[in-house]
């Protein structure tokens, strides 16, 4: 299995018990190949912010603390993700959430597969070097 980032959208579906090719792949990574599963700070933040109970928050917080996270040069990734957003805007590609450009840029910089359930990433992949799971 190759190294992969699972976007917040997949973690949300997974936590709700939704069965899809993305959540099935996440479960496979969790069961068979945790070393290849990476998180980004944005995914952790977005997911934890959306939880409804303290118990769920603490459960996922403890779980996320055991997973890999990319070490980042925040200045460089911030500038390059802004450039990605800017370049997409010039191509008249509208990205609803600028944080998706940050997640995408981290995946691009690390040549990592991005697994998602968010149309923003499809638009980014069609207009950049982003590799997405289909």
Language-model segment annotations:
Residues 1-39, 49-62:
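Short, well-structured N-terminal submotif of metal-dependent ribonuclease cores
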Residues 8, 41, 97-101:
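Conserved glycosyltransferase catalytic-site signature
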Residues 55, 61-70, 74:
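Active-site-proximal, substrate-binding regions of enzyme catalytic domains
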Residues 1-3, 104, 108-134:
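Acidic, PIN/NYN-like endoribonuclease modules and their adjacent C-terminal/linker elements
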Residues 7-8, 47, 81, 107:
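Generic structural signal for small/hydrophobic residues in well-ordered secondary structure
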Residues 11, 44-47, 121:
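A generic structural signal for short hydrophobic patches within well-formed alpha-helices
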Residues 70-113:
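Active-site neighborhoods of divalent-metal-dependent phosphate/nucleic-acid chemistry enzymes
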Residues 6, 39, 72, 115-116:
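Short beta-strand scaffold positions
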């Amino acid at each position: 299995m190759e190294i992969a980032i699972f976007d917040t959208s997949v973690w949300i579906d997974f936590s709700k018990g939704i069965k899809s090719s993305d959540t099935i792949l996440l479960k496979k990574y969790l069961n068979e190949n945790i070393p290849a599963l990476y998180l980004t700070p944005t995914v952790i933040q977005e997911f934890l912010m959306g939880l409804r109970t303290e118990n769920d928050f603490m459960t996922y917080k403890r779980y996320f603390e055991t997973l890999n996270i990319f070490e980042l040069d925040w200045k460089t990734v911030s500038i390059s993700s802004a450039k990605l957003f800017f370049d997409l805007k010039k191509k008249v590609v509208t990205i609803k959430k600028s944080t998706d450009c940050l997640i995408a840029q981290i995946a691009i910089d690390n040549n990592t597969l991005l697994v998602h359930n968010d149309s923003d990433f499809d638009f980014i992949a069609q207009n950049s070097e982003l590799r997405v799971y289909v």
